[in-house]
Structures are given as C-alpha cells and as structure tokens.
From Swiss-Prot:
Residues the record marks as active site: E52
Residue positions binding Zn(2+): H49, H53, E129
Source organism (scientific name): Acanthamoeba polyphaga mimivirus
The entry's keywords: Hydrolase, Metal-binding, Metalloprotease, Protease, Zinc
EC number(s) given by UniProt: 3.4.24.-
Gene Ontology biological process terms in this record: proteolysis
Family as reported in the entry's similarity comment: Belongs to the peptidase M16 family.
Domain of life where this protein originates: Viruses
Name the record gives this protein: Putative zinc protease L233
A Pfam family recorded for this sequence: Peptidase_M16
Record-linked InterPro entries: Metalloenz_LuxS/M16, MPP/UQCRC_Complex, Pept_M16_N, Peptidase_M16_C
Length: 440
C-alpha cells in the first residue's frame, strides 16, 4: 500500500494513502488529539463534543446552509466523532469533486465561526442526543463501567458531558478550547482513495502551514495511569452491578476484567484470546451459548483500550430467566482456558483466531473512510507510528499458545471481575448469582 507521511514545519502531520483502483472515491479528514479526557478538572465536561458539533455549523466564509448544500450537491458523506482522547472530522465523496471537497474540509477546520444563536440551537440538539444515549442500555452500561473502573479520573466522565455542564458552555469557552487544542502540533490531516498526491499537496501545505502553535499549556491525562492501575489492584472480590431496564425484552450482561496497562505490550495475545472466546460461530462462547443451548443470539468479547489502561469485556444478551445459567456457562469456558494450560488451546483455534485478526486488519484497507480511520487513529495515538503490515502479520504468526495462556491467567481473575446487568431483574439476583458461581 502506498502510504506517505509528511510533517510541516509547524508540526502538523500529513498522511496520504493513494489507493490503486478504478473507483472514483476519495476520503479526507482531520484528527485532533483532544477528547473528554483533556477536559477533566480544567474545562467544562462535554466541550470537546460540543465543539465538534459547532465546527459544522458555519465558517467565516459560509453559513451552515451553504456548507451543507455544497456538500450534499456532491453526494458526499460527512460526519465527526469525539472520543475520550481524539476528535475526528471526515468526509468522503466522488473524487471528481476533490477540489471542492478539499476546499470545504479546509474551510470547516480553519475558519469556524461560533455564533451565539447557533450555540443555543446546538445546545438543544446535544440535549436530545443525551436522551437518545440514555435510552440505549449499552451506552448506559458503558458509562457505568467507566465510573467503576476509572473513578476520580478523566475516564469516569461522559464524552457528551452532563446536562449541567452543557447548559454552561458559552462562546468564549468554545473559542478558547479551539485555540488551545486545535493547533498544528496536535493535528493530523489524512487523505485516502483515488487521487494524486502531487495534485493536492501544494493546496494542503499552503493552507495548513500558516497555522501556528500557541503557548497554552494543555491538560494532560498521562499522569492518571498509576491512579487507574492502583484502583484496579484494590479490588479483592467479584462484584455485580444491576440496572433495571424494564423496557428491554432481553437482559444485557457485560462480564469485565481489568487489563491494567498490559494491552500496549500484549495486545496481540489479548486479541487472540478474544477471538478464541467469540470469533465466529466456531468460537467457544458461540458453540455453548448459541449452537448447543440456544440461550443467545449474539455474544462478543473485546478489549476497551485507552492510553494507560484497558478493560476486557464479555458481552452477551439473555432472556431474563436465563441470566444465571448463561453467566455460569461463560465462567465455565473461562475456567477451561485457565485450567487446561497452553495445550487446552487447539492449533485450529490459534490459526483461526490469527487469520480473523489479519482479515479484520485487511478490511480496513478496502474503503477510503476505513483507511483514514485506521491511519488517522494510529498516527494520532502514536506520533512515531510506522506502517509495516508484513511485520505486524509476522508477529501474529509467531504467537504461541503459551503466550495466549499466560495473558489469560494474568487478566481473567475472578477476584477482579465485575458483572454488569441491564434488564428486568429483581433486587437479590446479584447476590444469588455470586452464591451460585464457583470461583477459584
């Protein structure tokens, strides 16, 4: 893959990924190293996300109607995402309109115009978005998981903010936040798809190299790592957290374990473990929970990864009367992995899991939007990131059963386990579940 990276004199990184195909599609976007974690203790919670909304409202050159009309006239797709650590703005469209799309993308990022009337209207929009998220059980459970594992740190607060904090964000807050964090040495511009680098480079360079880095001291959350790890180490017995979701026809169960700060070193092993448990219908959880017992339609396991800490999650949905039985079966499969040693993992499971991970990586390179997401997130989270697919695949191929077994023993400890349940539950089901489960 033709992957090119350049750094302007002001520190802004440019990433270009021309894709050799006949499909006239191009995607482009900005990644900024700021999210809700940067707000903690210094800025109003939710301002990163609020600013993301406002960037699409209008520029000093165009009203929102003009912006959206021009984008829609090309048939472009456009959106933005705020996470705990990053904010991304992107659009994709027919590469025949690349000049127009690039002009709009640069205008949105470089010339935002925060008008008071727009701010008040968008405040209401965000309040409605809050209601939508509150009605989604998985979102509510994820917030609760963060509150439990990341107490008194930046990861304990919501990306969208609270009702009170959103009510109090004003124009001055937005302008200060933009000038503080939207600076070149904290930003990456990325373009992927059917385009020629030489035809767009001069325009991009001339617009972005004008940006200067301010002298503001931005907030950092890197010091939180030891605090989070210490909180995780304090837990000495499993706990259950119940949430009554009376409108749900199923109960969502999330069985979680702390990964501490191990993902950065053992990420591949943890990803293989995840695939052994839930990768495809031949996985251990799919076999027992769906194919053999019919207890669930879907099951999944995955790591929630942040800078300095991570959590391993097993997520399953059960009928209310099957919660206890379902959790028991999940624990039984974890027991087998822990107690049967490296040889308890079959060659077939290792090969399948590694191939699934490789396939997932390769699928990132089919669609230009996925390409900018892959390279954007990797570059913004690791300023020294180097793309080497062969090296990545070679490392996967050299993983052993012993490697996966050792990380399994390390992170899947029942005394550190927290189970979150959202559904139609009675008050004593939590104690009943813990009484019924056997833990070593």
């Amino acid at each position: 893959m033709n992957y090119q990276r350049k750094t302007l004199k002001n520190g802004l990184k440019l990433v270009f990924v021309p894709m050799n195909n006949d499909i006239p599609l191009v995607a482009m976007g900005f990644y900024v190293g700021v999210g809700s974690r940067n707000e903690f203790g210094a800025y109003k919670n939710g301002i990163s996300h609020f600013l993301e909304h406002m960037m699409f409202k209008r520029t000093t050159n165009k009203s929102s109607d003009e912006l959206f009309s021009e984008l829609d006239s090309t048939g472009a797709n456009y959106n933005a995402i705020t996470t705990t650590q990053n904010t991304c703005y992107f659009l994709s469209g027919n590469s025949n309109y690349i000049d127009k799309l690039l002009d709009i993308m640069l205008d949105i990022f470089l010339h935002p115009n925060f008008v008071s009337d727009d701010i008040e209207r968008e405040r209401k929009v965000i309040m409605e978005e809050m209601k939508i998220r509150a009605d989604q059980p998985q979102s509510s459970m994820t917030y609760q998981i963060h509150e439990v594992y990341f107490k008194n740190t930046s990861l304990s607060q919501k990306v969208i903010g609270s009702i009170e904090s959103i009510k109090n964000i004003d124009k001055n807050d937005l302008e200060k936040f933009y000038s503080t964090f939207y600076r070149p040495n904290n930003t990456i511009f990325i373009m992927a798809g059917n385009f020629d680098v030489f035809s767009v480079y001069d325009k991009i360079k001339s617009n972005l190299e004008k940006l200067t880095n301010n002298n503001f001291c931005t907030t950092s959350y890197l010091h939180e790592g030891p605090i989070i790890i210490n909180n995780m180490k304090k837990q000495t017995k499993p706990k259950i957290y119940l949430n009554d979701c009376l409108s749900n026809k199923q109960s969502i169960v999330m069985i979680t374990f702390p990964i501490y700060d191990l993902y950065n070193t053992y990420g591949m092993e943890i990803d293989v473990l995840s695939k052994i448990l839930s990768g495809g219908f031949s996985s251990r959880l799919a076999k027992i929970l769906r194919e053999k017992t019919g207890l669930t339609y879907s099951q999944n396991s995955y790591p929630m990864v942040y800078m300095g800490a991570a959590i391993f999650v097993v997520q399953v949905s059960f009928g209310t009367n099957d919660i206890l039985r379902g959790i028991k079966l999940v624990i039984q499969e974890i027991d087998k992995l822990k107690k049967n040693g490296p040889n308890g993992i079959s060659d077939t499971e290792m090969i399948k899991s590694i191939n699934m991970i490789k396939n997932g990586i390769l699928h990132n390179f089919l669609d230009p939007i996925n390409v900018i997401s892959y390279f954007g997130s990797n570059n913004i989270n690791n300023r020294n990131y180097q793309f080497d697919l062969n090296h990545q695949f070679d490392n996967l191929d050299h993983l052993s059963k012993e490697d996966v077994y050792q990380i399994t023993k390390t992170i899947l400890k029942y005394k550190k386990m927290n189970i979150f349940i959202c559904g139609k539950t009675n008050g004593d089901i939590g104690d009943h579940i813990l009484e019924q489960l056997y833990f070593d």
